[in-house]
């Protein structure tokens, strides 16, 4: 029985109630580790006392009671005192009795640090830095006695501090997506607090083709910073739009990373602040997401299906027969894109699913192209220097120059 190993452990190592109870953390319910450790010591003393009554006092049993007393077990200390034997408790072999009597002190440090930030938060995550020698001593016991029911001292510290901080501040513990993260150094008592970013998923539409004098598109970032009283906003987009391309229709996926927010308003209130802002970018369909959504969004870009409208000028006249020929040729056609960087050459295959067009007037053509999200649309139209094969220009046999490009729809 694994709990029977407790006496073997205490014969060799004096342990406080916390550090003994933690070795058997998976046994029993409704007990914290301090209560569990005390209960184990009570049980061991009762077993020893029963044997003394049945067998008489032996050196073995007396030494076991002394081992319990050295581990700070008050009933064992009194038991020996009644026999005229005085035993002083030793320091806990694992924690040195320097951890669990300071929990309230550390809780006050954490609470004061959080309150001094002057920010809104509803959840927190708490971690601790525990000296390596303490962790190694704990590990040596679980290894030596083959204990499989233990939990780590860091886990107990984090849980006990977390419960008390939560009760004092009225905020919840959230391991996955906290508003703030706290780390306490149990050696120094110092506290580090990190304000966690907020991630907002949205769809953006770029309604203006022209850009400002600095060559940049104006996002309503200042409105977002204002809403969250944040330090900054980082923009993560699902793909990139070539310069001068409008994004219409349902818009392109985007995630806004709000850095060090002091306020945490509802996204509906933020959306109301962004409406009719007069910026180049219009944001819709706002929702809170996890940080992992950024990686997932970027990984899906190549699987997007994008519908482009391209207005192009051609060197020669384009006939309806040319349009039909392009339509038939590019239905579900693979296109190879070549990227050169110095001597390195990289090829990427993209799909063109559908191509339609109409002649607006002589040498002015409008194309509707439905293709894979990673297709370089300008290169597909004009062909470049053979960087995209096949291309519209290459198939027609004369120059085709795109002058306007709009994204009409993105299916993700």
UniProtKB/Swiss-Prot annotation:
Q: Briefly, what is this protein's role?
A: Responsible for synthesis of pseudouridine from uracil-54 and uracil-55 in the psi GC loop of transfer RNAs.
PANTHER family for the chain: TRNA PSEUDOURIDINE SYNTHASE PUS10
Q: What is its EC number?
A: 5.4.99.25
Q: Which domain of life is it from?
A: Archaea
Q: Which residues bind substrate?
A: 308, 376
Question: What catalytic activity is recorded?
Answer: uridine(54) in tRNA = pseudouridine(54) in tRNA; uridine(55) in tRNA = pseudouridine(55) in tRNA
**Species whose genome carries this gene:** Vulcanisaeta distributa (strain DSM 14429 / JCM 11212 / NBRC 100878 / IC-017)
Statement: the UniProt record of this protein carries the keyword Isomerase? yes
Q: Does the keyword Transmembrane helix apply?
A: no
Please report the stretch or stretches of sequence annotated as the THUMP domain: 73-197
Q: Which GO terms describe its biological process?
A: tRNA pseudouridine synthesis
Return the similarity comment: Belongs to the pseudouridine synthase Pus10 family.
* Species lineage: Archaea, Thermoproteota, Thermoprotei, Thermoproteales, Thermoproteaceae
The protein here is known as: tRNA pseudouridine synthase Pus10
HAMAP family, alphabetically? Pus10_arch
Q: Annotated Gene Ontology MF terms?
A: tRNA binding; tRNA pseudouridine(55) synthase activity
Coiled-coil ranges per UniProt: none
Which enzyme class, named as a word? isomerase
């Amino acid at each position: 029985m694994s709990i029977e190993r407790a006496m073997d452990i205490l014969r060799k190592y004096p342990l406080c109630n916390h550090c003994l109870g933690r070795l058997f953390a998976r046994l029993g319910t409704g007990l914290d580790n301090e209560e569990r450790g005390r209960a184990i010591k009570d049980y061991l003393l009762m077993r020893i006392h029963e044997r003394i009554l049945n067998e008489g006092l032996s050196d073995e049993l007396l030494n076991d009671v002394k081992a319990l007393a050295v581990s700070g077990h008050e009933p064992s200390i009194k038991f020996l005192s009644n026999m005229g034997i005085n035993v002083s408790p030793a320091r806990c072999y694992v924690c040195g009795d320097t951890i669990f009597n300071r929990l309230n002190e550390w809780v006050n440090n954490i609470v004061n640090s959080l309150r001094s930030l002057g920010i809104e938060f509803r959840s927190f995550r708490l971690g601790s830095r525990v000296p390596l020698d303490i962790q190694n001593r704990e590990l040596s016991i679980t290894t030596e006695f083959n204990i499989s029911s233990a939990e780590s001292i860091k886990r107990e510290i984090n849980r006990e501090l977390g419960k008390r901080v939560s009760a004092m501040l009225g905020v919840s513990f959230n391991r996955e997506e906290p508003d703030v993260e706290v780390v306490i150094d149990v050696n120094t008592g110092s506290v580090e607090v990190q304000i966690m970013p907020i991630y907002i998923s949205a769809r953006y539409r770029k309604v203006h083709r022209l850009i400002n004098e600095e060559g940049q598109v104006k996002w309503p970032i200042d409105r977002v910073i204002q809403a969250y009283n944040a330090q900054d906003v980082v923009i993560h987009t699902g793909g990139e739009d070539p310069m001068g391309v409008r994004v219409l229709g349902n818009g392109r996926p985007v995630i806004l990373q709000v850095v060090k927010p002091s306020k945490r308003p509802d996204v509906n209130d933020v959306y109301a602040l962004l409406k009719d802002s007069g910026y180049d970018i219009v944001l819709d369909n706002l929702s809170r997401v996890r940080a992992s959504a950024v990686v997932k969004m970027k990984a899906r870009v190549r699987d997007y299906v994008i519908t482009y409208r391209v207005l192009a000028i051609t060197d020669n006249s384009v006939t309806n027969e040319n349009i039909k020929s392009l339509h038939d040729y590019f239905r579900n056609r693979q296109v190879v894109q070549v990227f050169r960087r110095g001597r390195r050459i990289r090829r990427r295959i993209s799909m063109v699913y559908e191509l339609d067009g109409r002649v607006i007037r002589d040498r002015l053509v409008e194309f509707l192209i439905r293709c894979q999200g990673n297709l370089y649309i300008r290169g597909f139209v004009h062909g470049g220097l053979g960087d995209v094969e096949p291309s519209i220009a290459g198939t027609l046999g004369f120059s085709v120059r795109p002058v306007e490009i709009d994204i009409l729809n993105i299916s993700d």
